[in-house]
C-alpha cells in the first residue's frame, strides 16, 4: 500500500521494518501450525485428547517467565491463547456450550478461555449447558459459579451434585455493566431488561438515575439487549459486545455498583471424552462434601486439610433438599491429588464425610 506524501523518512523506515517483522511472524505462525498438525496426527494414533489445559497453562507461564518486554505479560497470555486456539482448530473443532444468546458474559468467558477458533453453542439455560456437555452435543460447557458481588450461582452448584461432568478449568471476568439502548439518551425509558443478578449489581446506580423505571428480569443480559434492539422504549444492562451484536448505544458505561465486580466460570466436560488434567504445578481441586449433623462435624471435616498443610481457598455451604437441616459444603483447595499431601488429606477427609465427590482438578486461572 502506497504511503501518503509528506511522511517522515524515519517513519517510513520503521513501517517497513514492521512489515518485514509481520511477514516473519506469519511464516513462524504457519510453521507452528504445521508442527501442531504433526502433533495432532500422533495424538490420533495414540487416542490422546487435543485440548490439554495443563499444557497450555504451562506454555503461557513459561512465556511469561522468559518475556524480556516491552510487551507486557498481560498481553502475552491472550496472544498465545489465540495462537493455540487457531492451531487446535486445525486438528479438530472445539464445540463449547455456554449460556446464550450471543453477547453474554458467558460467551465472553468461553472466548477468553478457548480463544475465538471454536464452535459456539449458545444455550437458553444453565441446565441446557450441562445437558449439551453431558450428551456429547458439546465438548465443553462454560458454567458461571460465583460472582464477587452476588455470591455463588446456586443453580450451578446444585447441578454439580448429580452431574457426571467434571471441572477441567476455570476463568474469570471483570464484569462491566453498561446501560444500552437503541436511542442514545436516558429520557423516555419505560423498562430496563436484564438478568436478575445484573439488576442487583447495578441497584444503586438505577435507584439514583432511573428510580421510577420498571426493572424487568429476563433470562440473560444478552436477551435484554436483544429486546432493547427491537423496542426503543426499552433499555438493557449488558456488555459492550452485546451493544455491537444488537446495534445499541452505550448510554451510560460501567454502571455496576462495585468497580471490581468479577464473575468466575468453571469449564466442564465428560470423563469419557476428556481425562482429568495432570498436575501443572499451580492447581486447584474442587469438591463437594457433607457430614452427619452432630457437634463438631464441620471442625472434624477440616482437620485433615490443616494436618497435611493443604490450603483451602473457598468454602461455601448449600442446604440439602432433604428437609433435615443438612448441608453440602463446596470446597476449593490448592494442589493436585497427585501431590502426596493433597492425596493424604483427601483420603482422610473422605473417611469422615457422609458424602464426598471431587468435582475436578485443574490449573489455577492463568487467563
Label each residue range with its predicted role.
Residues 1-367:
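Domain-level signature for soluble enzymes in the chorismate/prephenate branch of the shikimate pathway
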